[in-house]
Amino acid sequence: MNIDETKIEQAITDKTKVIVAMHYAGVACEMDTIMEIAHRHGLKVVEDAAQGVMSSYKGRALGTIGDFGCYSFHETKNYSMGEGGALVINNPAYNERAEILREKARTARNSSAVRSISTHGWTSATAICPVS
C-alpha cells in the first residue's frame, strides 16, 4: 500500500514540489531511493508516519528521514488523541514558517514571523482557514 518508488520519477512534472511517502501499517517506504530521487530533482520529502509509529527504516525512526515528518493524532491512528498531530522538521530554517502554520497565521509567538505574513489565500500556507 506504500508508494511505489519505481513510479515516482515518471510522475514528476515541472509543478512537483514534494514527494509524500506514506508509511502504512508500520511498513517503511524505500526511503533511500525516494531521497535520492528527491535530491536529483530538487524536491522535498514529506513522510506521513501516522501509521509508522515505533517503526524504522535502516535504524532510523519513520518520520525522521525526509525533510518533514507528519503524525496524525486522529482517532483512527496509532496514537489517538482525537485531533491534531505533530510535525518533525529536519532543517531549522523551516522552524519560523512552522510556527506561522501552527497558529494558522492568526498570531505567532515570534513577532518577526507575524510581520512576514503579507497575504492570505486558500492555497497559501498562511490561509486563515486551513483546507481539510
Per-region residue spans from a language model:
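Loop/helix-junction capping segments adjacent to catalytic residues or to phosphate/diphosphate-binding pockets
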Residues: 2, 28, 79
